[in-house]
Amino acid sequence: MIKLNNVTFRYRPSDENPAINNVSLEIKKGQYVAILGHNGSGKSTLSKILVALLKPQKGELFIDGIQYSKENLKEIRKKIGIIFQNPDNQFIGSTVEDDIAFGLENKNISRDEMRTKVVEYAKVVDMEKHLSREPEYLSGGQKQRVAIASVLALDPEVIIFDEVTSMLDPKGKSKVIQIIKQIQADKDKTLISITHDMDEAILADTVLVFAKGKLVAAGSPKDILNEEKIIEIAKIASPFIYKISKHINGIEPTYVEEELISQICK
């Protein structure tokens, strides 16, 4: 689905260290991948490369077999949707309904069909009761859920969540993570979560760890958590449950609360 071959990107030619430094990776269709790293690791730059907002100076990028080029930019962007960190920067419509409908207006569908789709995707993010509300009356978490619905309505093959919970309170964060898990279970989508939060990354099938513009590790969440050197290099905070389980003799470290309780009760 997504393939990078030796991709390098600098914001300025004079930059000694590239923001993305000779990165090669592959993400298969239907995978849920977390791209994990501390501030300045290059993960958000990578997300902008994937949606063709930034062009690599070196290397190759393929989306669904299509190589990135100026000629096929439009085709590539149709395949990928992105939800950004700040919910205030992506609310376009004057109401929730208008915002979800915005992208559908270029798809040549009837008003009735558009309305049906708006309601359908509002339900996915639990915002169907707020369709007439204006953005200033919504919480940050609600705005982020509307942004997710707006992307889902466009039906992209790949959805990128770029630090989508970092500006939310615990309640808003929990709800958005719940929706991401629901999309993973119900939709035939390739999901990419850009995050510095291991609690969010452990939901993924595969974790790609970045530090100083380089891909330094790849594996399952458990594999990554067991690599102390990688945790240190990437400045990742391990989940609370994992930290507890690691210090209990005779218990295999786990980040799943139910697994920890089960092992303790044996």
UniProtKB/Swiss-Prot annotation:
Single GO cellular component term: ATP-binding cassette (ABC) transporter complex
Q: How does it sit in the membrane?
A: Peripheral membrane protein
Provide the binding site for ATP.
G37, H38, N39, G40, S41, G42, K43, S44
What CDD domains would the database entry show?
A: ABC_cobalt_CbiO_domain1
Which Gene3D superfamilies does this UniProt record tie to the protein?
P-loop containing nucleotide triphosphate hydrolases
Membrane-crossing ranges are none
Q: Where in the cell is it found?
A: Cell membrane
Start and end of every ABC transporter domain? Answer: 2-237
Q: Which SUPFAM superfamilies match?
A: P-loop containing nucleoside triphosphate hydrolases
Write down the PROSITE patterns for this protein, in alphabetical order.
Answer: ABC_TRANSPORTER_1, ABC_TRANSPORTER_2, CBIO
GO terms assigned for molecular function: ATP binding; ATP hydrolysis activity; ATPase-coupled transmembrane transporter activity
Q: Does the keyword Nucleotide-binding apply?
A: yes
Q: Which InterPro entries match?
A: AAA+_ATPase, ABC_transporter-like_ATP-bd, ABC_transporter-like_CS, ABC_transpr_CbiO/EcfA_su, ECF_ABC_transporter_ATP-bd, EcfA_1, P-loop_NTPase
Provide the E.C. number(s) assigned to this enzyme. 7.-.-.-
For this UniProt record, give its keywords in alphabetical order, as a comma-separated list. Answer: ATP-binding, Cell membrane, Membrane, Nucleotide-binding, Translocase, Transport
- Recorded family membership: Belongs to the ABC transporter superfamily. Energy-coupling factor EcfA family.
Summarize the subunit comment.
Forms a stable energy-coupling factor (ECF) transporter complex composed of 2 membrane-embedded substrate-binding proteins (S component), 2 ATP-binding proteins (A component) and 2 transmembrane proteins (T component).
What is this protein's function per UniProt?
A: ATP-binding (A) component of a common energy-coupling factor (ECF) ABC-transporter complex. Unlike classic ABC transporters this ECF transporter provides the energy necessary to transport a number of different substrates.
- How is this protein named in the record? Energy-coupling factor transporter ATP-binding protein EcfA1
Q: Which organism is it from?
A: Mycoplasmopsis synoviae (strain 53) (Mycoplasma synoviae)
